[in-house]
Design a protein with these regions (language model features):
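A charge-rich, low-complexity, intrinsically flexible signal that marks solvent-exposed coils, linkers
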Residues: 1-96
Length: 96
């Protein structure tokens, strides 16, 4: 299997895991506890189905952070999302 074929086969997994991690990160930034966090993570993951690309996730997280006084720019949220995506890709493409 070529790298391109692996990339196409794992794209959905990468996005789902990236969004899961983004939800955890943002939820913790919002001060959510163990009871609230799973629901919020699910909301973040669902937000990715609004439009192609990560923009919908970035906007949701940015709005949520701003609504609780956490002023983090969309650019910084996008950078965090990109770091998470890179990490997830490394995990999925690594071999034992």
């Amino acid at each position: 299997m070529t790298t391109c074929e692996i990339e196409m086969a794992t794209r959905g997994q990468v996005n789902a895991r990236r969004n899961y991690l983004m939800g955890l990160w943002a939820g913790r930034m919002l001060g959510m506890g163990d009871r609230e966090l799973p629901g919020y993570v699910h909301e973040v993951m669902r937000s990715d189905f609004e439009e192609p690309g990560p923009g919908d996730v970035v906007r949701k997280v940015s709005r949520d952070l701003a609504s609780r006084g956490r002023k983090i720019s969309e650019e910084d949220v996008l950078k965090q999302l990109q770091v998470m995506e890179k990490s997830v890709r490394s995990e999925l493409l690594s071999t034992d």
